């Protein structure tokens, strides 16, 4: 009899422990939803891009001068992408407007946006952009950051259901093909990846270019996947605790992790990720937290707001693919931290941050 009572007690204890465990799992495994685009955010973000894509000054040209005849205004040199302070920001300013229209085809400012886009992305203007890249002194202009954003813009135009935007894709196509070929050529000959937290980051450039290439350029997709494996597949112990650098707007570790998510099968990716960022999958908030911008008037220091957004899109993509609520929660925290501080009136951030915020929102979709 005493053994029977002991057995029953053990069963009851086991059931109680199981019940407690289930409650704990329910608390920690609740579905966390990413922050996504809505009409209010679209209305807020479009103003940044709409205002700046035809604002010619201030402007940072990043030009190599062959002689005095090269000295021209930004609009003369880049009749399509002359606004938003620099070429790449003008490109992703266009991308922002196109994506807002793609998401909200009846957007209240649709006609005004399309009119402005038709003015900048004309056939004649695009041919002038190509002339600039053909110049012997500027063949590597905007490599690879601006190139990657150009392919993002092309992808969004190609996938639009708005006839006027489809027509603009045809206008842009010669430049798209030029950039596509430049990416193939460069990624093939690059011996070592560039691992910084700013524009030249190879993983970022490859990741954005691959998003385009998967549907529109089999050759570029093949090159990126092959080179990404050569560059990154054997990487271990990425020093994410060294991040961020003071001028970073990209996370070298997370950009690489996001690229490899697109390159490796899921099973292989899990093994790779746990070696590349040990412990990150289970406790990501122990490794990174939102960064603070001390001086938003300083263009380089303002990069850190962009870092919060780019971390967001990396964490969303990885977190959603792996059903990892902790990553999604951390992404939400990063997004909210910078989104609430965007409208400071400082052009140092206003000319580009809307694109980063929108891309983060799209990654959460």
Which sequence ranges carry the predicted segments?
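Solvent-exposed loop and edge beta-strand segments that line ligand/cofactor-binding
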Residues: 34-39, 74-91, 132-148, 189-202, ...
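Extended ligand-binding groove/face enriched in aromatic
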Residues: 83, 91, 98-212
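Fungal-biased detection of long, low-complexity, Ser/Thr-
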Residues: 289-365
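Bacterial signal peptide processing site
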Residues: 16-18
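Well-ordered alpha-helical scaffold segments within catalytic/enzyme domains
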Residues: 30-37, 91-107, 148-165, 205-216, ...
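Long, well-ordered core segments of solenoidal/helical folds
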Residues: 45-58, 112-131, 171-192, 220-240, ...
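C-terminal motif of bacterial Sec signal peptides marking the signal peptidase cleavage site
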Residues: 12-14
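Low-complexity, Ser/Thr/Pro/Gly-enriched N-terminal "stalk/linker" regions
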Residues: 27-82, 346
């Amino acid at each position: 009899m005493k053994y029977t009572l002991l057995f029953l007690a053990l069963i009851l204890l086991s059931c109680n422990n199981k019940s407690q465990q289930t409650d704990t799992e329910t608390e920690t495994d609740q579905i966390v939803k990413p922050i996504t685009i809505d009409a209010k955010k679209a209305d807020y973000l479009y103003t940044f891009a709409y205002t700046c894509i035809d604002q010619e000054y201030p402007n940072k040209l990043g030009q190599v001068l062959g002689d005095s005849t090269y000295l021209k205004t930004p609009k003369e040199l880049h009749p399509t992408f002359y606004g938003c302070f620099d070429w790449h920001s003008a490109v992703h300013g266009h991308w922002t407007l196109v994506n807002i229209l793609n998401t909200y085809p009846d957007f209240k400012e649709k006609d005004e946006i399309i009119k402005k886009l038709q003015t900048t992305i004309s056939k004649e203007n695009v041919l002038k952009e190509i002339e600039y890249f053909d110049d012997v002194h500027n063949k590597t202009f905007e490599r690879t950051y601006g190139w990657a954003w150009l392919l993002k813009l092309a992808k969004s135009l190609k996938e639009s259901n708005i006839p006027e935007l489809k027509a603009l894709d045809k206008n842009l196509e010669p430049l798209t093909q030029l950039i596509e070929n430049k990416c193939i050529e460069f990624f093939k000959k690059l011996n070592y990846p560039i691992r910084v937290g700013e524009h030249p980051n190879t993983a970022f450039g490859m990741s954005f270019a691959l998003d385009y290439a998967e549907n529109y350029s089999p050759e570029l997709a093949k090159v990126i996947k092959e080179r990404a494996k050569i560059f990154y597949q054997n990487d271990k112990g990425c020093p994410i605790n060294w991040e961020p650098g003071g001028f970073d707007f990209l996370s070298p570790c997370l950009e690489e992790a996001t690229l490899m998510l697109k390159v490796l099968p899921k099973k292989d990716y899990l093994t790779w990720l746990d070696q590349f960022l040990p412990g990150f999958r289970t406790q990501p908030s122990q490794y990174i937290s939102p960064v603070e911008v001390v001086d938003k008037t300083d263009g380089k220091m303002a990069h850190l707001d962009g870092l919060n957004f780019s971390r967001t899109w990396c964490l969303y993509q990885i977190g959603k693919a792996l059903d990892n609520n902790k990553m999604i929660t951390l992404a939400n925290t990063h997004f909210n931290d910078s989104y609430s501080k965007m409208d400071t009136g400082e052009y140092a951030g206003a000319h580009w941050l809307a694109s980063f915020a929108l891309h983060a929102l799209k990654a959460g979709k």
